[in-house]
Design a protein with these regions (language model features):
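N-terminal glycine-/charge-rich "phosphate-binding" loop or analogous flexible N-terminal tail
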Residues: 1-48, 176
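Conserved N-terminal Rossmann-fold NAD(P)-binding element of oxidoreductases
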Residues: 10, 154-155
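Short beta->alpha connector loops at strand-helix junctions that form conserved
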Residues: 34, 75-76, 92-103, 179, ...
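Rossmann-like adenosine-cofactor binding region
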Residues: 59-63, 181-274
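Phosphate-binding beta-alpha-beta segment of Rossmann-like dinucleotide-binding domains, i.e.
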Residues: 90, 98-151
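Rossmann-like dinucleotide-binding domain for NAD(H)/NADP(H)
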Residues: 94, 230-320
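Hydrophobic/small residue at the entry helix of a nucleotide-binding pocket
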Residues: 160
Length: 320
């Protein structure tokens, strides 16, 4: 390669123990930082042609100072942390990766769903507290709920939403796909239902939508009040799709039964996050996407995006 690139990975620790130097050093000079403070991002970018990142935010200030930057390679699907307008103004292409973690995210969704219905986590904890006999005699609060004939509402019907629907139907569940209010659908949306109707009828509501102006705070207290008291909310989309103050109120006051999420509005959540105090709230640290198979597919796709860029064939999220 005649013109060697200068490539930097700003938050390499977010993808785990996966060897990357051999992949990217053949394109030029490769540098990686385990994590980067937000205040340091702009200064690191100024000398590099390509930046790889997962959760680092890039705004107007960062693009203004990144005089040599040509390409941002995202190690994921979401891009709400990137100022696409500023990127375009400064001639920087943005490339994300879709579909690499469909199976792993769908698996965690079903893990959440089954855990909420069978109470495995809570039962295990009770046994560890030496309450086996108590549970065997009095199961009033810990009986299993069958999946058969339960209704799963899905918000966001891309690769992951469709895979979750497939899994759910194999467990005997009925699936209702919700429309995002205000969104125009170009595909056949006859099999989609109004959001409020889905919320009223579903037993479990699973979120797999991206964060946009239309989905931010979409699931608020007014909408949760439309749901059954026995309803369960799962969020494997983006944290701000649910208003977390409203979710806390709904869980605390038994407006809905429980919630499980892999994403939060602030990640990691602050120490005083009230949701973390609740027994009917389950959270994992935004790791639904991270399986070994997913990582292999992810970095193969990222390298492919880099090659497409070098061949002037990149489409990406935004392209010059």
């Amino acid at each position: 390669m005649e013109n060697k690139l200068k490539i930097i990975f700003l938050d390499r620790n977010t993808v785990g123990p996966f060897e990357l130097k051999d992949i990217f050093s053949k394109y030029g000079e490769y540098t990686e930082f385990n994590l980067t403070n937000d205040d340091d991002v702009a200064s690191y970018l100024k000398d590099y042609d390509v930046v790889i990142l997962n959760r680092i935010k890039l705004g107007k200030k960062e693009f203004e100072q990144a005089k040599h930057l040509k390409l941002v390679l995202l190690t994921g699907t979401g891009f709400n942390h990137i100022d696409l307008v500023a990127a375009k103004e400064h001639g920087v292409s943005i490339a994300n990766v879709a579909g690499y973690s469909t199976n792993s995210v769908s698996q965690l969704t079903m893990t959440f769903l089954l855990n909420e219905l069978t109470k495995v986590e809570k039962l295990s904890q009770k046994v560890k507290e030496n309450k086996w006999n108590e549970l065997s005699i009095n199961m009033d609060n810990y009986y299993h709920v069958d999946t058969e004939d339960k209704i799963l509402g899905i918000l966001g019907y891309g690769n992951i939403g469709q895979k979750v629907a497939e899994y759910a139907e194999s467990f005997g569940m009925k699936v209702m796909v919700a429309k995002i209010p205000g969104r125009k659908y170009t595909d056949n949306s006859d099999n989609r239902y109004d959001l409020d109707e889905v919320l009223e009828k579903c037993d479990i509501f699973s979120i797999h939508a991206p964060l946009t102006d239309l989905t931010k705070d979409l699931i608020n207290l007014d909408r949760m009040k439309k749901m059954k008291k026995s309803a369960i909310i799962l969020n494997l989309g983006r944290g701000p799709i649910i208003n977390e103050d409203d979710l806390y109120y709904a869980l605390k006051n038994n407006i809905i039964a429980s919630a499980a999420t892999d994403v939060m509005t602030t990640e990691p959540p602050k120490n005083d996050c009230k949701l973390l105090e609740l027994d009917n709230f389950t959270v994992t640290p935004h790791l639904a996407w991270k399986s070994q198979k997913s990582l292999e597919r992810l970095f193969a796709a990222i390298e492919n995006n880099l090659n497409l860029f070098l061949e002037n064939k990149l489409i990406g999220v935004e392209s010059k």
